[in-house]
């Protein structure tokens, strides 16, 4: 999966996310809804307008969960087990949506980290978020 250097890049970049979880999460969700409007079907009860309290709250939950994954990179299955159960059995979210949100989150990182979002950081986050998406989709099999 990730080598030592990639893990260090992820952890270092994550330090820039801390304190901005709600903003980054809301921005990623707003991007996902704009670029992939079919994802809105999973949020029929949400106010999907820019800067809505519901999007901000859920965005913070998403990015907080990613922070847990960053802290437990070597054991993602255990760290994300409850979240995987929730999305597979209760919410029944199509697993392709994890990849869509991952892509949008990477765009948010690139915008906010600017020059610090190097190609190496991009590759590391691409691999990391693909692993997170795969773990979240494990219960669908």
From Swiss-Prot:
Organs and tissues of expression: Red blood cells.
Molecular function per GO: haptoglobin binding; heme binding; metal ion binding; organic acid binding; oxygen binding; oxygen carrier activity; peroxidase activity
Disulfides per UniProt: none
Pfam families, sorted: Globin
GO annotations of cellular component type: blood microparticle; haptoglobin-hemoglobin complex; hemoglobin complex
Domain Globin: 1-141
Residues the entry annotates as binding heme b: 58, 87
UniProt GO BP: hydrogen peroxide catabolic process
InterPro entries, per the entry: Globin, Globin-like_sf, Globin/Proto, Hemoglobin_a-typ, Hemoglobin_oxygen_transport
Transmembrane spans: none
Keyword terms of this UniProt record: Heme, Iron, Metal-binding, Oxygen transport, Transport
Summary of the function given for this chain in its UniProt record: Involved in oxygen transport from the lung to the various peripheral tissues.
Subunit structure: Heterotetramer of two alpha-D chains and two beta chains.
Family: Belongs to the globin family.
Identification of the protein by name: Hemoglobin subunit alpha-D
Source organism of this protein record: Chrysemys picta bellii (Western painted turtle)
Primary gene name: HBAD
């Amino acid at each position: 999966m990730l080598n030592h250097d990639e893990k260090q890049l992820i952890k270092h970049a994550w330090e820039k996310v801390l304190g901005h979880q709600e903003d980054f999460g809301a921005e990623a969700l707003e991007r996902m809804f704009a670029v992939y409007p079919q994802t809105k079907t999973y949020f029929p009860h949400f106010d999907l307008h820019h800067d809505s309290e519901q999007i901000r709250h859920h965005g913070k939950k998403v990015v907080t969960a990613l922070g847990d994954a960053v802290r437990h990179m070597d054991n993602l299955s255990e760290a994300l087990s409850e979240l995987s159960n929730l999305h597979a059995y209760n919410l029944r979210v199509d697993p392709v949506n994890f990849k869509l949100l991952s892509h949008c989150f990477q765009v948010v990182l690139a915008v906010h980290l600017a020059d610090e979002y190097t190609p190496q950081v991009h590759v590391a986050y691409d691999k990391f978020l693909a692993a997170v998406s795969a773990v979240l989709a494990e219960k669908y099999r």
